[in-house]
From Swiss-Prot:
Keywords: Disulfide bond, Periplasm, Signal, Transport. One of its GO terms (biological process) is cobalamin transport. Part of the ABC transporter complex BtuCDF involved in vitamin B12 import. Binds vitamin B12 and delivers it to the periplasmic surface of BtuC. The gene is btuF. Disulfide bonds join 189-265. This is Vitamin B12-binding protein. It holds the Pfam family Peripla_BP_2. Residues 24-276 form the Fe/B12 periplasmic-binding domain. It comes from Pectobacterium atrosepticum (strain SCRI 1043 / ATCC BAA-672). SUPFAM superfamilies: Helical backbone' metal receptor.
């Protein structure tokens, strides 16, 4: 009798655990979509936001949110049992309305590089494949650690940090402060963000402000074909190397920030070895 009871109880617990895993997940931001796939939740996703284009299979899913807002009616019709949201990018009122319908909401709001693996481990509790989430988190931590170790070696060699301007747009001209993931990547690579002291995360700056701070390199998002236009924008007052980084990697607070960090660190390391970088 005891053996049968234990078998029945074990089966019940397994069924309950399986039932607790959400089966109909909606992502309301591109980086949240990437996080979900990295955490092994791809087969649980039923809808995503606009610009959710990675991995490629995400483009096949219905889109229920964009920069214009959230399609609340459609989301409710899809009957999700979990929503992945972003406080800074999603309007709060429809999220509050969704919460009123007792739909669980997980916010993915990474502020630091350490938050990325932490978020992956958080998603592991909702994933059919939690081991995949753990692998992704561990891999991210290990490779970020390798970049950090390389930076420490540069510091030990008394290599002065390059002064870097992180550029977004031209008219208006924006940059990022130390409160952003983008600036943290620059620091990880052993460089100095010239606007790290800004009191707002995404300050609008003038051409004159940038020139006064004398950057030794500029980082922009996009392909290498943007380099010539960026250099032309700053000449003749400023003639420094322009580094490009994949825009999606650099702008989304997801696992591919690691790729952005590797790309930037590699290019900055080359600049440090160049004689012109020692100005």
């Amino acid at each position: 009798m005891t053996f049968r009871f234990l078998c029945w109880l074990t089966g019940l617990l397994l069924c309950t655990a399986a039932y607790a895993i959400p089966q109909r997940v909606i992502s309301l931001a591109p980086h949240a979509t990437e996080m979900a796939y990295a955490a092994g939740m791809g087969e649980q996703l039923i809808a995503v936001s606009a610009w959710s284009d990675y991995p490629p299979e995400a483009k096949k899913l219905e889109q229920v949110a964009s920069w214009q807002g959230i399609n609340l009616e459609r989301i409710l019709a899809l009957k999700p049992d979990l929503i992945l949201a972003w406080r800074e990018g999603n309007p709060q009122r429809p999220l509050e309305q969704l919460a009123n319908f007792s739909i669980p909401i997980v916010y993915l709001d990474a502020k630091t590089l350490d938050d990325i693996p932490a978020s992956l481990r958080q998603l592991a509790t909702y994933s059919r494949h939690p081991e995949q989430a753990e692998r992704a988190a561990t891999d991210f931590q290990q490779q970020i650690g390798e970049l950090q170790h390389a930076d420490e070696k540069h510091k030990a060699a008394h290599t002065a940090p390059l002064r870097v301007f992180i550029q977004f747009g031209t008219q208006p001209l924006f940059t990022s402060s130390k409160a952003t993931l983008q600036s943290q990547i620059v620091s990880l690579c052993g460089a100095e963000n010239i606007f790290s002291d800004s009191t707002v995360p995404w300050p609008q700056v003038s051409r004159e402000q940038v020139l006064r701070r004398q950057p030794q390199a500029i980082i922009i998002g996009g392909a290498s074909d943007k380099i010539a236009n960026t250099q032309a924008f700053w000449q003749p007052q400023l003639t420094v190397p322009v580094i490009t980084v994949n825009e999606d990697w650099f702008s989304r607070s997801g696992p591919r920030l690691l790729l952005a960090a590797q790309q930037i660190c590699s290019q900055l390391a080359e600049l440090k070895l160049a004689p012109s970088s020692a100005k």
